[in-house]
Amino acid sequence: MSISSVAKRFAPAIAPYKKSLPLRNSSRFLEETIPRRLSLLLQACSNPNLLRQGKQVHAFLIVNSISGDSYTDERILGMYAMCGSFSDCGKMFYRLDLRRSSIRPWNSIISSFVRNGLLNQALAFYFKMLCFGVSPDVSTFPCLVKACVALKNFKGIDFLSDTVSSLGMDCNEFVASSLIKAYLEYGKIDVPSKLFDRVLQKDCVIWNVMLNGYAKCGALDSVIKGFSVMRMDQISPNAVTFDCVLSVCASKLLIDLGVQLHGLVVVSGVDFEGSIKNSLLSMYSKCGRFDDASKLFRMMSRADTVTWNCMISGYVQSGLMEESLTFFYEMISSGVLPDAITFSSLLPSVSKFENLEYCKQIHCYIMRHSISLDIFLTSALIDAYFKCRGVSMAQNIFSQCNSVDVVVFTAMISGYLHNGLYIDSLEMFRWLVKVKISPNEITLVSILPVIGILLALKLGRELHGFIIKKGFDNRCNIGCAVIDMYAKCGRMNLAYEIFERLSKRDIVSWNSMITRCAQSDNPSAAIDIFRQMGVSGICYDCVSISAALSACANLPSESFGKAIHGFMIKHSLASDVYSESTLIDMYAKCGNLKAAMNVFKTMKEKNIVSWNSIIAACGNHGKLKDSLCLFHEMVEKSGIRPDQITFLEIISSCCHVGDVDEGVRFFRSMTEDYGIQPQQEHYACVVDLFGRAGRLTEAYETVKSMPFPPDAGVWGTLLGACRLHKNVELAEVASSKLMDLDPSNSGYYVLISNAHANAREWESVTKVRSLMKEREVQKIPGYSWIEINKRTHLFVSGDVNHPESSHIYSLLNSLLGELRLEGYIPQPYLPLHPESSRKVYPVSRFIEKEMRDPDKV
């Protein structure tokens, strides 16, 4: 707009009066009407892009001597403030001495400072205003509160709240709304509730502020209660209200209330085609009512990208991956273009199927249609590639990122963990720390398992200190991850200490503690914690049951396992396929193969886990034929494809009965018939198969033929075979590898020492013992359990402190005699050095350890 156009617009209105009156003696029309009409034009120019036109209007007013009164001057000042022209604003403010005219000029400048991000200047200008004796009004405080929130100045908010209360403005809905929103931003609920109660006239806007604040703070029950009070006060909800309450219904799965709200939306006449339709779709989807969601979707006159996204994300979050992909195809067919949110929601379904080619196709679509790769889509792509085993593609995406934040770093860390690249995962975390990005909860939960796997206890303690410093130690998910990390590092005492410190223990934390105790050779502690869990009022789930059954299997304690089995039947938990599979394992390890088979036969649903459990049970009891029959039944009749665990159990079964040919045949069948690549465990099992049969050359050739470096388990298996068959030369090769791969494992030192002792190489035995002392490796004593009259008794190898130790060893000698009659030939005790050979030790003190060695290897 030019100055000429302004003149043309107002010339007809001024012309009749110019003839009769000089401008200096203007009429009331010129004094009041013209400035007020021009003020509308000034308001229209209150935009940074229209600053030039605003200055032209100002010039027009000056040329025609229309400006000069406080009303017009304040409007001009407001225009400059809205345009962010602080130099012109300051000139007018001080030249025309608007400092004491009214509060409006001060408010204009304060709001302009806040709007343009000059937050400290806004607060400073407020205090300058107070120095000039100008009192703030209800328009002043919302801007100041907004500035304090942006500056994260919580004390400033408290100061403003006290000032508002002292001035009696806390009952004003606009001032109260700004303060309520500020306190809720910091997660405070008590103060906003008091402020809300003091407001005299509560309208829908302030109710929406309160309800959305409750939802943001996680006080979902307060949202429902507040909405009920709002309805009783006869305040009509609007679309914002319904969106908030429907989101709470979706989060808490309150489908009945959600359906009632749907009816209320229809009755109230709120625009259904707005955001409410998406909130309703999300609510029905999250509550698992996909039929209703689909009907609602089909009834819509138009479905935009957001609406399609609601349906796709609902299917994905409910685990219905195939349906989400079908809906995506339908979206493309209908001509609606997907956006970044669409693919961020869809990619987890691609990850579920681990289809790398499909992942690449989606990536190509994103690039071809120039869809913006924001942080969330980038992390979703990285996560999808990692889960589809496309590690190099994920690395390429990360390297091409212009900017990365904690979300992308977390995707990389968890992706490396998923693919077993633990060192890379740890290096990525170190990179995150190096670039001074603070890890969030998900990052910590992702990196703690890596530290546990790598046994990096020192780093784990440092990270635990960081967690305490940041106040994350009371979060259940992080607490569980810390417990898991310490347990994997062999520090169960610290794990239990962390568990005891948790202020709130949910079912996940209890399950984590039970599982770790069961896996760390402390099954009795696992059962004790399982009992404590029940006493504390936490309901058991399938994970709790499975962990406790594993502990019973490791003790073994068949009586307690039977009690848990009865509990499962009574509380309808016996239909869970994973719990039943653990039950099979428990009965088998307790020696009751018949009960294990009965559980398997009565299972309504059988998956690969349950078949593997029963195959392993038969194999461990030396029933290879039964294992093979079950294998063929699984493949041919049930149509279930065997996995890596299946073949591991079959080869292990062959190992138990010494059927080398059958074991080798199944090992080859893995790759040739099923395309399954053998892992370290399979090679270790084949080495053990050859080793037990005395075919050490073939065992060593198997190790050398491995397509990847053998781990400590493989070399340890070979070393055990060398000790058994007195092959010192090959034992030297295996021991040198073990010293590099796992120098802290005492079991390998014992194997090496026994191999040398077999060959009467006492000097080498002494060296091994000295090496153990030098590296501070403590020999872990052997333990055994026996259950008598529903009570489990623990025995320690070589223990003479028990008051009835002489009677115990006498009984062991009697049992040894019975074993000899059955054909068992015990391995005589081999001393760690020649001087010890002069001492006499009862063989029975070492029977338990020697009998456990083959299973341990």
Curated annotation (Swiss-Prot):
Domain of life, source organism: Eukaryota
GO biological process, one term: RNA modification
Entries under InterPro entries matching the protein: E_motif, Pentatricopeptide_rpt, PPR_At4g14850-like_plant, TPR-like_helical_dom_sf
Region Type E motif: start-end pairs: 714-789
Stretches for region Type E(+) motif: 790-820
Matches recorded under PANTHER family: PENTATRICOPEPTIDE REPEAT-CONTAINING PROTEIN
Entry similarity comment: Belongs to the PPR family. PCMP-E subfamily.
Protein name: Pentatricopeptide repeat-containing protein At4g21300
Taxonomic source organism: Arabidopsis thaliana (Mouse-ear cress)
